[in-house]
């Protein structure tokens, strides 16, 4: 359904697009997914909030800067994509969607995240890349089930020590930030499998050989004097990594992301909540 909508709205003027989308969505799709990506939306169609068994909602690549409080009716929602919009702050209503597992917030104008985000204790994947973050919000460290964190292309200079509380975290993407040192907290997270610090300003890498779960470290495009030491079998992408020609770090990242997304598609079986009569 989402692809069909995008194909049509590409030819519809922006001032008429909102009305078209509203008319098109008369009832909840059988797959419990609504994809309004690239629909030129300035306002979220409130009547979608009546689809109380909705599981996936994609609002990527629109012009949204707010969401209605009625969104809180979607208590079965597990995936919410708000990337490529105009949000300067995360709408509080998002923090009421307690079954969310995957939240995409990349390519907005976020400078921080609200404390209420800690209410999303089912969150496994959080993407906040390409925002205006100068520090990683400490509330992220309270998301105890988080497995994947993508915070690349911000202005991060360090990571909070509390990050090591996230014992389920397996993948952290920090490319394109302002790190001048390898984040010390990552040295105390032996369960990490993928670390990406590509395109930072790191001059020296400590040994990562003790990180027993590590599978891939991407450290290219840093002014480093050495390659990070890793355990046997760990793949490195960056200067001095191997004697053989090193792979393209972008391809390595895309491969890892594709692998993660295939795993994310297997959402945990959360029981649907009964619809309310409100």
UniProtKB/Swiss-Prot annotation:
Domain of life: Eukaryota
Each LRR repeat, start to end: 30-51, 52-74, 76-97, 98-121, 123-143, 144-166, 167-189, 191-213
Entry-linked Pfam families: LRR_8
Region annotation Disordered: where it falls in the sequence: 239-278
GO BP: any one term: cardiac muscle cell development
GO MF terms held by the record: actin binding; alpha-actinin binding
Comp. bias intervals (Basic and acidic residues): 239-250
Disulfide bond in keyword set: no
Subcellular location: Nucleus
Compositional bias per record (Pro residues), positions renumbered to this chain: 269-278
InterPro entries assigned: Leu-rich_rpt, Leu-rich_rpt_typical-subtyp, LRR_dom_sf, LRR_domain-containing
Principal cellular location given in the protein's record: nucleus
Protein name, as recorded: Leucine-rich repeat-containing protein 10
Lineage: Eukaryota, Metazoa, Chordata, Craniata, Vertebrata
Underlying gene: LRRC10
């Amino acid at each position: 359904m989402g692809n069909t909508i995008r194909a049509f709205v590409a030819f519809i003027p922006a001032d008429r697009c909102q009305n078209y989308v509203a008319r098109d969505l008369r009832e909840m799709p059988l797959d419990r997914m609504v994809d309004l990506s690239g629909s030129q939306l300035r306002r979220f169609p409130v009547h979608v909030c009546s689809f109380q068994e909705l599981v996936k909602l994609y609002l990527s690549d629109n012009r949204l800067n707010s969401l209605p409080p009625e969104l809180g009716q979607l208590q079965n929602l597990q995936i919410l994509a708000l990337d490529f919009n105009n949000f300067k702050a995360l709408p509080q209503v998002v923090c009421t969607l307690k079954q969310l597992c995957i939240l995409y917030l990349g390519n907005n104008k976020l400078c921080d995240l609200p404390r209420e985000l800690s209410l999303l204790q089912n969150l496994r994947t959080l993407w906040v890349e390409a925002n205006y973050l100068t520090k990683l919000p400490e509330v992220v460290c309270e998301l105890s089930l988080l497995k994947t964190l993508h915070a690349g292309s911000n202005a991060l200079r360090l990571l909070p020590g509390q990050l090591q509380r996230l014992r389920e975290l397996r993948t952290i993407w920090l490319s394109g930030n302002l790190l001048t040192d390898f984040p010390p907290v990552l040295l105390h997270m032996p369960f990490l499998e993928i670390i990406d610090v590509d395109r930072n300003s790191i001059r020296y890498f400590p040994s990562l050989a003790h990180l027993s779960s590590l599978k891939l470290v991407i450290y290219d495009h840093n002014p480093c004097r050495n390659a990070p030491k890793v355990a046997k079998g760990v793949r490195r992408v960056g200067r001095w990594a191997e004697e053989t020609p090193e792979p393209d770090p972008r391809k390595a990242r895309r491969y890892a992301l594709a692998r993660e997304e295939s795993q994310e598609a297997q959402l945990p079986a959360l029981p649907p909540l009964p619809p309310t009569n409100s």
